[in-house]
Amino acid sequence: RPPRAQGHEVAAISPLSGGCVARVACADLRGGERVVVKWAVAPGARLDVEAFMLRLLGTHLGDLVPRVLHDEDDLLIMSHIPNDGVRSDAGMGALGEALGRLHGVGSSAFGLDRDTLIGPLRLPNAWGDAWTDFYGERRLRAMAREAHEAGRLEASDRRRVDRLCERLG
């Protein structure tokens, strides 16, 4: 669905790389604004969940995160962040500083009020009191279970993940 469906007329569009559940393109709108558009191509893609995550990151990182302009289950329109597309020491340093700011965000518990996604995989985020329990159960074991059920992780490796999680706790 093109951005015109949301009241915008596209002057030019060019594909961007990336995305495992959606196609991504840069769109120049007739009014002069440049936006990034993602539209779902994988079954069950939830671009509205990505929009939630971008908004949450934006509360901590401001203009380093694209601003969500419109979202639906299968469509996401966000601001374009100008860049030259070249990896640099300065860019990697800025990334490190941003990650440091995120790691400085405190809370009395670990989790979120809703589950999120990483690509096509659901990330459970039920609240927990201990980081080791949260990480072991909701990241390591959850991903190992998904990978095993998809036939991408042997049962012996899943048991190894389980043993690691037991040692974490």
Task: Report residues per predicted region.
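A broad structural signal for alpha-helix termini and local helix breaks/kinks
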Residues: 3-7, 61
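ATP-binding pocket architecture of kinase catalytic cores
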Residues: 14-133
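A generic local structural motif
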Residues: 11, 65, 166-167
